Design a protein with these regions (language model features):
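An anionic, glycine-rich sequence signature occurring as long contiguous blocks
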Residues: 20, 79, 83-178
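Extended, regular secondary-structure scaffolds
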Residues: 14, 36, 40, 44-47, ...
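Short, conserved catalytic/metal-binding motifs centered on acidic residues
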Residues: 1, 16, 63-72, 89, ...
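Short acidic, S/G/P-rich loop/turn micro-motifs used as interaction or catalytic elements
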Residues: 26-29, 71-75, 160
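Acidic, metal-coordinating catalytic cores used for nucleic-acid/nucleotide bond scission
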Residues: 67-75, 95-98
């Protein structure tokens, strides 16, 4: 028995509601789907993007932010999105280095995309990811759990608060909940 296999990439808004879906009969992975299907469509359809003048006036302002899981981790891709489109990327750090001292973490109020405010122990640093050619500086935010585990996220949303980044990435679970109850 042979069946056609496809991969669906769901693009959701900040509240986890579906914006659109890309079906790929031949799939070469998330990064290729982002480059060829998702980003071109977002550039056309995302409302309220900054003007060219606004982007020129503020070197840290992004056109919009895309958030994805570890499969999309690629310093070269982050650099490409920022250089070519001024799109910021937020994802989990696939290769975090050693744990940070617990003294760097502070109890922080994080507003999730649905408006819920949660208390999290967070710390932030600038970090270099990738190699000399394709690497770049990113904002790294870590969440400290009660067990001492550190969850690391990285962001090229340079002009935003780390708390916003943390809330956005941690809210990504609303997508999984959407599919669970769909």
């Amino acid at each position: 028995l042979c069946l056609r296999g496809t991969t669906d990439y769901w693009v959701n808004d900040a509240l986890g509601q579906p914006f659109f879906c890309v079906e790929r009969p031949v799939d070469h992975g998330l990064l290729e789907a982002l480059r060829s299907d998702v980003v071109p469509r977002l550039l056309k359809e995302v409302p309220s993007q900054p003007t060219t003048e606004q982007l020129k006036a503020d070197p840290y302002l992004s056109r919009f932010v895309i958030i994805f899981d570890r499969e999309g981790y690629s310093p070269a891709f982050f650099r490409e999105m920022w250089a070519e489109h001024r799109i910021a990327c937020i994802t989990y750090h696939k290769y975090p280095k050693e744990n940070w001292p617990e003294s760097e973490f502070s109890e922080t109020q994080v507003t999730m995309s649905g408006g819920e405010v949660l208390s999290r122990k967070l710390a932030e640093r600038g970090s270099w990811i990738g190699d000399r050619r394709d690497g770049l500086w990113v904002r790294e935010v870590r969440k400290l759990t009660s067990s001492g585990h550190q969850t690391s996220l990285i962001s090229t949303a340079y002009g935003q608060l780390a708390l916003e980044d943390a809330g956005r990435l941690f809210s990504r679970w609303c997508q999984e909940n959407f599919f669970r109850y769909m």
